[in-house]
């Protein structure tokens, strides 16, 4: 059964982009969008993402992705975060976050004013105390798995990221699956490890990788799970296209279809 759409947050999308039904929907990724990380903890988080927090400890998630894959690195699939997802929250969620910060600042200002007003005549006037030091939040761990178009063929893809950076792995699909444009992928928690799978229509689920450290030191409430689409390539228009007009494939959005999303 698909998850409730009301629990999802849109990242790098308008808040209205969350579909009413999560069983079948589409995400459109413009050119030059990606979810990636290079040292030192520099995130590229421009890919459209829909994610949700879980009421219960994460068990597994799976979905089928498909698209007209055309450009190098076109991709879409599942993503899981252990910590705050990097990127821009859309619409109402962003406004609510801004309101919370404003309210906190107003409360702090009121407290400071009240303290100054009530100071006795014997107290020595002093400058405002410096703000408390708040260390930056550690970069979140995340993993994405899906279907990616690379070297003119579709592959099962996975990326694992820590605060130090990310790695990228491609797996060739079996010959009987190589010409298909869809793939069902799954992520599953086993102990502290995150197992990454894809489904072969002949032999069933096949292991892509085991991420042994993913859930180590992670609170259940910090886990966020969802889907993403991205088109990292950005080649720009050719001279012919600029002269004759009309959008080329390099300037069009990648529309990724998601079917049968399940999150446990």
Regions inferred by a protein language model and the residue ranges of each:
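Extracellular glycan-recognition regions
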Residues: 1-264
